[in-house]
Amino acid sequence: MIQGIQITKAANDDLLNSIWLLDSEKNEARCVAALKGFEADQVVSINDLGQFESREVAIEAAPRIEGGQHLNVNVLKRETLEDAVAHPEKYPQLTIRVSGYAVRFNSLTAEQQRDVIARTFTESL
């Protein structure tokens, strides 16, 4: 478990008022901020800090930004979309998924229609 502390009293003056993250499982201390003697992100053994008194400092985990994939599933044939480009009057209700939204294929511009056709169909994975 990781605990945030501010050192309030220590034999080593460089530790006074410094802020650390203590990892009790690894027996490590990571310097968050110190006026002198330690660099930010420097990792030392908790034992290397010597005797000290501290107060707990609340820490908040940064949100994880995870990448991801977005998948739109359109179940139809390439020929159907190509025919809809050539004969839009035959497909007034043709609806596809684009960026998670349902849209009428005929409401897209010609460039958007070509892009959908190019991205929707692949020869292999």
From Swiss-Prot:
The keyword Oxidoreductase does not apply. InterPro entries: Auton_GlycylRad_Cofactor, Form_AcTrfase_GR_CS, Gly_radical, Glycyl_radical_cofactor_GrcA. PROSITE patterns: GLY_RADICAL_1, GLY_RADICAL_2. Keywords: Organic radical. The keyword Transmembrane does not apply. GO terms for cellular component: cytosol. Residues 5-125 form the Glycine radical domain. The modification Glycine radical is found at residue 100. NCBIfam families: spare_glycyl. HAMAP family: GrcA (MF_00806). Acts as a radical domain for damaged PFL and possibly other radical proteins. This is Autonomous glycyl radical cofactor. It comes from Vibrio cholerae serotype O1 (strain ATCC 39541 / Classical Ogawa 395 / O395). The gene is grcA.
